[in-house]
Amino acid sequence: MDSKQQTVRLSDGHFIPILGFGTYAPQEVPKSKATEATKIAIDAGFRHIDSASMYQNEKEVGLAIRSKIADGTVKREDIFYTSKVWCTFHRPELVRVCLEQSLKQLQLDYVDLYLIHFPMAMKPGENYLPKDENGKLIYDAVDICDTWEAMEKCKDAGLAKSIGVSNFNRRQLEKILKKPGLKYKPVCNQVECHPYLNQGKLLDFCRSKDIVLVAYSALGSHREKQWVDQSSPVLLDNPVLGSMAKKYNRTPALIALRYQLQRGVVVLAKSFSEKRIKENMQVFEFQLTSEDMKVLDDLNKNIRYISGSSFKDHPDFPFWDEY
């Protein structure tokens, strides 16, 4: 099945495929893997591809997209591609610079969706994680509304079809929504979301504002030491997911993905295994009962895998608020 048929309308009139392919990989994974996996994903039916400047793999992901266009598998307009502006490019004059760098790496003319990756500005420069001599991150003071105005200009210039945010809490979303002279509101908020962190309150708030929630780490997480607390439980080992997978004759990953789709959440599935990439497309082939949805809702433990703890002293750190 082609996931293109399964889309959600964004507030600006564009449509986003509800199943997306995530391309982030820990540093030790060779970048060439991103090309290979993205090609497999497109062949399997994925049409929504998610990356970011920070992932430093856009050259490889772009190569996969362009090769699948060249061999006739897809046209450019069949692909929904997301990139994100990193924290060191929050100054208004740098937002478009970051996007143009991404487009150059990708060798594409536009992105379908451009997001502010985190609501925290860091010192501009070559380093994605600028640190002082004591190894402490160096922050920058930029009003998120100024960054947003630069995002609006990227949309007006045709470099991004839609614009949104990622890792924002309710207060930070409201700040943009209440901005005087707001031209375009964020179409989505991409956040960590899975049965252990189901984001129920944030989802309700976003729904009330016609903002789509997009789930990353929907299968738990890659568990990379730099970002993830190693003592956190492995989501896909959860016995409830395990028994439900048996009941539906699916995998625990498919149960976790289907859970999001039935809540109206756009979900990113990340895998570099050909078998699992193809398997994840089965999410459209079955439906969870409302009772089982309730059971999954009750798994919530507010466990955040990507805690962002290295940024926790940033004045705009998003995860202190309840949601």
UniProtKB/Swiss-Prot annotation:
One of its GO terms (biological process) is steroid biosynthetic process. The keyword Transcription does not apply. Substrate binds at H117. Its EC number is 1.1.1.-. One of its GO terms (molecular function) is aldo-keto reductase (NADPH) activity. It is an enzyme of class 1 (oxidoreductase). The keyword Hydrolase does not apply. The record marks K84 as: Lowers pKa of active site Tyr. NADP(+) binds at residues 20-24, 50, 166-167, 190, 216-221, 270-280. Active toward androgens, estrogens, and xenobiotic substrates. Also exhibits low 20 alpha-HSD activity. Shows a-stereospecificity in hydrogen transfer between cofactors and substrates (A-specific). Preferentially catalyzes the reduction of 4-androstenedione, 5-alpha-androstane-3,17-dione, androsterone and dehydroepiandrosterone to testosterone, dihydrotestosterone, 5-alpha-androstane-3-alpha,17-beta-diol and 5-androstene-3-beta,17-beta-diol, respectively. Monomer. This is Estradiol 17 beta-dehydrogenase 5. Belongs to the aldo/keto reductase family.
